Amino acid sequence: MSSLGGGSQDAGGSSSSSTNGSGGSGSSGPKAGAADKSAVVAAATPASVADDTPPPERRNKSGIISEPLNKSLRRSRPLSHYSSFGSSGGSGGGSMMGGESADKATAAAAAASLLANGHDLAAAMAVDKSNPTSKHKSGAVASLLSKAERATELAAEGQLTLQQFAQSTEMLKRVVQEHLPLMSEAGAGLPDMEAVAGAEALNGQSDFPYLGAFPINPGLFIMTPAGVFLAESALHMAGLAEYPMQGELASAISSGKKKRKRCGMCAPCRRRINCEQCSSCRNRKTGHQICKFRKCEELKKKPSAALEKVMLPTGAAFRWFQ
C-alpha cells in the first residue's frame, strides 16, 4: 500500500509538476506577447511623434519664413505614410522628406543665382548707359559729319541760285535798255510801259514777281546750272513784236525782191484750221493759195507799206505770249 501510495504521489507530483510547468509556460506566454506588443508600440511611437511634430521654420536670406500659405498644409504627410506599413513605410517617408528638402534647396539655390544674374545684368546696363561705347561715339561723330556736309551743300546751292538770279537781273536790264523805246517828246515810253505792266499785274500773277516792272516774257530766258542764257529766236520774235514793221523795212532796204514772211502774230496767222468754204479751200487746183481766213494781214498790204514805221504800245506784244 505504501508503495502504491508513493507511486501515486510521484505520479501526482509529476502531473502537478507537469501541470505547473504547463501552467507556467502558459503564464509566461501571455507575458512575452505583451512585451512584444509594447516593443512594437514603442518602436512605432517615435515615428508618429516625429511625423506630428511641426517642421522647423525655414528662412531665406531676407529673413522671411518660407511656409505654405494654407494652414492645413503645414502638417501634410507624404503618400507613402498612408500606403506603407512598419519600418519600411517610415524609411520611405524619411527618404521622401529628404528628397523634397533637397529639391527645395536646389530651387532656392537656382533662385539665388537668377537673382544675382539679374543684379549683374542691371549693373551692366547701368554701366552701358553711363559710359557709351566707342561704337556709339563713332556713330554720333559720323552723324555730325554728315549733317555738316549737308549744311555746306545747301549753302553752296543757295549761293549758286543767288548768282544765277543776279545774272538774270543784269541780262534783263541790258535787254530792256536795248529794246524799249526811248522817252519821246510826247511823253510816251516809260510811263506807258509802267501802265501796261500794272494792267498785266492786275490780270494775272507773274512767274517772276520781282521782275514785274519789266515787260519781258520769262520764256525768253533759259536758266541752266551753267548760267542764264537768252533764247535768240524768242528775242528775235520779241524784237519784231516791239517793232513789227522794222524787220520788213530792213528786208525791203537790203533786197527789194525778197519774199516776205508771215508775221505769226495777227489773228489769221494764229488760226490753225482751214475754213473749207472759201474759193481757195474749194479749188484744190490752186493748192499754193492759203485759206483766205488764214492769210496774214501784213502780207495783204503792198510792199511799199513796209517803209512806213508803225509803233505799237510798249508791252503789247507780250500779251500774245500769255
Swiss-Prot record:
Keywords: Cytoplasm, DNA-binding, Metal-binding, Nucleus, Phosphoprotein, Zinc, Zinc-finger. The modification Phosphothreonine is found at residue 53. A motif (Nuclear localization signal) lies at residues 257-262. Zn(2+) 2 binds at residues 275, 278, 281, 291. Residues 11-20, 28-52 have a biased composition (Low complexity). A zinc finger (CXXC-type) spans 256-297. Signal peptide: none annotated. InterPro entries: CXXC4/CXXC5, Znf_CXXC. One of its GO terms (molecular function) is DNA-binding transcription factor binding. Residues 1-10, 87-97 have a biased composition (Gly residues). Zn(2+) 1 binds at residues 263, 266, 269, 296. This is CXXC-type zinc finger protein 5. The gene is CXXC5.
